[in-house]
Amino acid sequence: MSESKNIPLVQVLANALMKSSFDPKLEAWVNDLHEKISSFMQANPNLLSDLRHFLDDFKNLPARQKEVWSKAASLGWYMNFESSISMKHYVGLGQQALNSYMEKEIQADWITLTTSIIAAYPARAEILTCAFELHNEGRYIASIPLFFAQADGICDQNLDAHLFADGEKRKLAIVERSRNAEPFTDVLLELLQIKTPFNARISKYEAKDKLRAPNRNCILHGSCNHLDYGTEINSLKAFSLLAFVVLVFSKESLIQ
């Protein structure tokens, strides 16, 4: 390897510039710039390596984010219009920490979220308003089934496949939509296909299962093993699913 190939890029550029004809002021500026760049590179020897790692991380961001959101869903929570990056931190802390965080976040953003949902689907306004009022009144036994029903219907309205049924049809529709989806929208769409406590079989009624999320099948089929579902946190979890479904189809390219 020739010696010139070992010369830093900044030095090569500086040498090339210095061989050109400049007036004294421009030459002084070039010298000053060279010194500053050299000093900066000496002070940050790992800059290029760090930049390369950053670009690699950015490239893998959708896959990593999907992993976080999938984990959150397995614990009964979905992101929404107002979710912050802090959600990732609490997902890592586990069920109890995520419950406390999401409960506070959704309650703080309740008016904004409910208003956005109704604005997105005005034809459903009467039903949605009723569901939100039932939740506000503490009538969670009634609000939860309505949240599930509207999430199911909104999914069908957009994909021509229900959220809690039509598994193969929904899968094919998601694959087709993902081809022309905006960045990250394909990741959100794929989350509609994963297995969660929300869409688990009726046989999943043990205490550990019910702590994660309300089981839609148990609730709507009146399972005697899930008669204790009517809690505030379960209603908030069902609402988070509804808000997420609305978010997924909020892009103009996806709304039919």
Q: What are the functions of these language-model segments?
A:
Residues 19-114:
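Internal, Lys/Arg-enriched amphipathic helical interaction segments that engage polyanionic partners
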Residues 72-133, 147, 159-180:
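Helix-loop junctions and short alpha-helical segments
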Residues 199-256:
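Charge-enriched, short contiguous segments at helix-coil
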Residues 119-120, 176-214:
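Short, mixed-charge amphipathic alpha-helical segments
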Residues 1-28:
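Intrinsically disordered, low-structural-confidence terminal and linker regions
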Residues 142-144:
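Solenoid-repeat scaffolds in large eukaryotic assemblies
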